[in-house]
Amino acid sequence: MAVPKKRTSMSKKRIRKNIWKKKTYFSIVQSYSLVKSRSFSSGNEHPKPKGFSGQQTNK
C-alpha cells in the first residue's frame, strides 16, 4: 500500500534553493567572463554583425 512521503522542512527547501541559485550565478559569471575574453582577444569590444560597414548613407 502507498504511504505518503514526509514533508520537507522549510530550512531544507531554503538550503536547496540557495544551492541552486549559487550554481546558476556562477555559471552566468563564467559565461560572461568567457564572452569578455573572446571579444577582447578579437580586438573588438562589441563585435559587429557581418556586412555592417559602420557608415550610414544619406538618400
From Swiss-Prot:
One of its GO terms (cellular component) is chloroplast. It is found in: Plastid, Chloroplast. InterPro entries: Ribosomal_bL32, Ribosomal_bL32_plant/cyanobact, Ribosomal_zn-bd. GO terms for biological process: translation. It holds the Pfam family Ribosomal_L32p. The keyword Lipid biosynthesis does not apply. GO terms for molecular function: structural constituent of ribosome. Keywords: Chloroplast, Plastid, Ribonucleoprotein, Ribosomal protein. Its main location: plastid. Residues 37-59 are annotated as: Disordered. Belongs to the bacterial ribosomal protein bL32 family. This is Large ribosomal subunit protein bL32c. The lineage of its organism: Eukaryota, Viridiplantae, Streptophyta, Embryophyta, Tracheophyta. The gene is rpl32.
